[in-house]
């Protein structure tokens, strides 16, 4: 699959998903960038905005298997990864796969699970495998996690450690629909017999794997590499930031910028690609100082100030 075909495939997937989910184009783009960049997405939003429907619809459109895990305080790691069960017939243990063995996994309200269970998901996200009783099991490919957390209810939750937040390539939110969007939501509900809409499959699993490989062929000018490094360096020098973007975050920005180029149907990354992915990729990686938190500093404003402080290179590429 070439870059033009991958861009067309992205449009087809999102056009199909938009028939089921009502949200703005920026939200859909960010989800698709997570898929293309072979990363994972963190959704922080209130209940009832369509997070589960979005994850299920993306899976259906991509022709991938889908699994939903409701995280609770009593959820054990084995409830997510699976466990070894004794088979009395042949007197041996057999591995029973947990719900994480799917192409797209919705980790719902991930911050309600204890740290040990969160850590089990951490290995799966980073390594594409799980370890149970010392034995390693490979997860299906592609493997993509959409995790959600409720920003309002904090009682009885276990905030995600910075190491785990850093594993998510993109963080975004659906938000409430506009008035016209909510009316359209009701109109669609009135036109079907079931509560949840269905989505047509537009790609196969092999096509998804091929599509996710296309960003590796995108060209990135050396000046843009310098630009991205200067942006992340600037986050570490901001007086409002206690912990800036990690080197892993710099790599994720690079990967997501390439994915943005594919999404736009280009063979090369532009400065606008870097700017466009900066907020969803960088903001959630920042740890603010206590004074900044007391002053109610918005991480998005920090990213804006950083982008304004770094000189934008002039880069020109000729299409092949």
Regions found by a protein language model. Give the residues of each.
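C-terminal engagement/docking regions of AAA+ P-loop ATPases
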Residues: 237-320
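P-loop (Walker A) phosphate-binding loop of NTP-binding proteins
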Residues: 46, 80, 148
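Conserved C-terminal "switch" segment of AAA+ ATPases
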Residues: 3-7, 157, 174-245, 266, ...
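Walker A/P-loop
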Residues: 35-73, 77, 86
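Conserved alpha-helical scaffold flanking the Walker A/P-loop in AAA+ ATPase domains
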Residues: 31-32, 86-106, 135
